[in-house]
Amino acid sequence: MKYLPLLALATLASALPEKRATPYGIDVSSYQPTVDWTTVKNNGVSFVYIKATEGTTYISPSFSNQYIGATDAGLIRGGYHFAHPDLSTGATQADYFLAHGGGWSADGITLPGALDIEYNPSGSECYGLTAASMVSWIKSFSDTYETATGRYPVIYTTTDWWTTCTGNSAAFGTTNPLWIAIYSSAVGTLPAGWQYETFWQYADSGTNPGDADLFNGDAAGLSRMALGS
């Protein structure tokens, strides 16, 4: 979640989201190894996404403690996986994510896992894949996750990356909830296929640790999202 283009980061200064009566959230990783979850909850945060895995060789050393801490504080929480389509298949990475904290259960406090797919921080921006191959990779990850859990994963991305690296595919808009990253006062144009975003990452800093997010709905809607109803 730290690899947004510099141009996007430059727009962050003084940017605030549209005023909404909506649940606030955060997302964290090993960059935030120690989080005071009680304070986060008292600050009005309702949900959190926590980095679990990356590729097929990395497990966040902070994930377990962060997940337990968020649970104990009464937050709705879920895990996310940073994709590396250049290293292995989508199915292989979905299985790795599922095996290391990325699962879902209908307990009312677990969000479906999220696939974080964005510009490559260490190589070709589209990981060396054509748009068609990228769409196939994402579908492989998504279908594998859905088969295992009964839920399609949330897709975290930017409109710019999605347009560049998938050819602005509309293939996932009716199945996968969208978590859009745009550091501005409004979400702007969404990737093709999605009529609305489910989550919006609107800043990479704020009162709480990690990135700042909004759920597009009310508290009851967030609970339904966790339940899968």
Regions found by a protein language model. Name each.
Residues Y145, T149-T164:
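Aromatic-lined carbohydrate-recognition surfaces of secreted/lumenal glycan-active proteins
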Residues E18-Q32, T38, A171-S229:
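Functionally critical loop-and-helix segments that line ligand-binding/catalytic clefts
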Residues R77, R151-P153, L178:
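Hydrophobic anchor at the start of a short beta-strand
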Residues E18-A148:
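Substrate-binding cleft of extracellular glycoside hydrolase catalytic domains
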Residues V28, I50, L115-I117, I155-T158, ...:
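Conserved beta-strand positions
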Residues T89-T92, T163-A171:
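Glycine-rich, charge-decorated loop segments at or immediately adjacent to ligand/cofactor-binding or catalytic sites
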Residues M1-P17:
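Fungal secretory targeting signals
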Residues L98-A114, Y119-P121, G167-Y196:
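Structural recognition of alpha->loop->beta junctions
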